[in-house]
C-alpha cells in the first residue's frame, strides 16, 4: 500500500492530519466525518439506518467540535474532491463505503453554515411557565399554518450541545426569554454565547420577550444577534409579553 499524509489544520486540532491510501482509495479521516455514538456491532454506515439513528449525533458532533472551523473544513473538502476516495474511516463512528456524496454534502452544508431544512427552532427560557406557554402557542400556530418542521426546547432543561446542533439544522430560530435583572435570562445568554463562539451565521431570528416591568430581554437579544452573529436577520415584528400571554400579545 502507498499512503499520503495530508495536513488538515483545525479539523479540529491545529496539528491534525488525514491519511489517504492511494492503493485502495481509503481515507483515514481522523476527526473529519466523525460522529458521537457507539457502533453497537455494526461497523459500516450502510449497515444501519444512518438518517434515522445517526445523523443527529453526526450533526451534534460536527457543530460542537468542528463548527467554528468551517473554512478549514471547506479547504479539506476541496482537497478530498481531487482524489478518488472509496471509503471514509473516521476516528469516531461508522466506516463509510457507500453513498459518500450524502455525507460529504452534509459536511459541506454544515461548514458553510447553511441550514439543512426550512423550519423553525423555538428555544425558550421560562421562570414561571408563562414564556413556555407562549413558545408552545407559537409552535402550535406554526404547525397549523403548515410549518410542521418545528422543534421546541427549554434552554434550561437541554444540554447546549443539542441546541447548537438544532440551530445548525433549521433555517429560522425563535428565542423566547424573560427579562432577568434587566438582562437576558442567563441560560439563554449562554446559548447565544455558544452560537457566537462557534461562528454561527446565516439565519433568520424571531424574538419573544417577557416581563412584568422594564422588559429588556428582547432588545438585548436583538443587539447580541446583530452585533455578534454574522449574516443573521432579526425580524422586526418582535413579540412582547407582559407576564402571561393573552389575545393582546
Locations of regions flagged by a protein language model:
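Catalytic core of the metallo-beta-lactamase
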Residues: 1-47
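Short hydrophobic segments within beta-strands
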Residues: 29, 91, 123-125, 208
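FMN-binding flavodoxin-like domain, especially the glycine-rich phosphate-binding loop
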Residues: 39, 50-88, 93-95, 137-151, ...
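Short N-terminal or domain-adjacent regulatory/targeting segments
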Residues: 89-116, 190
Amino acid at each position: 500500500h502507498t499512503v499520503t499524509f495530508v495536513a488538515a489544520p483545525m479539523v479540529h486540532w491545529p496539528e491534525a492530519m488525514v491519511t489517504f491510501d492511494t492503493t485502495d482509495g481509503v481515507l483515514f479521516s481522523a476527526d473529519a466525518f466523525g460522529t458521537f455514538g457507539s457502533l453497537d456491532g455494526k461497523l459500516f454506515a450502510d449497515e444501519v439506518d444512518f438518517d434515522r439513528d445517526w445523523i443527529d449525533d453526526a450533526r451534534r458532533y460536527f457543530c460542537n467540535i468542528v463548527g467554528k472551523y468551517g473554512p478549514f473544513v471547506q479547504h479539506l473538502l476541496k482537497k478530498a474532491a481531487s482524489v478518488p476516495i472509496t471509503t471514509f474511516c473516521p476516528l469516531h463512528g461508522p466506516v463509510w463505503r457507500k453513498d459518500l456524496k450524502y455525507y460529504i454534502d452534509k459536511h459541506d452544508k454544515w461548514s458553510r453554515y447553511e441550514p439543512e431544512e426550512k423550519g423553525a427552532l423555538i428555544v425558550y427560557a421560562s421562570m414561571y411557565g408563562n414564556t413556555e406557554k407562549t413558545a408552545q402557542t407559537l409552535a402550535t400556530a406554526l404547525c397549523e399554518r403548515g410549518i410542521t418542521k418545528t422543534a421546541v426546547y427549554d434552554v434550561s432543561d437541554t444540554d447546549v450541545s443539542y441546541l447548537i446542533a438544532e440551530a445548525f439544522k433549521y433555517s429560522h430560530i425563535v428565542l423566547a426569554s424573560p427579562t432577568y435583572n434587566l438582562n437576558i435570562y442567563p441560560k439563554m445568554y449562554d446559548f447565544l454565547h455558544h452560537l457566537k463562539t462557534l461562528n454561527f451565521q446565516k439565519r433568520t431570528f424571531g424574538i419573544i420577550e417577557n416581563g412584568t416591568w422594564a422588559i429588556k430581554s428582547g432588545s438585548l437579544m436583538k443587539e447580541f444577534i446583530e452585533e455578534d452573529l454574522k449574516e443573521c436577520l432579526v425580524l422586526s415584528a418582535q413579540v412582547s409579553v407582559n407576564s402571561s400571554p393573552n389575545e393582546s400579545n
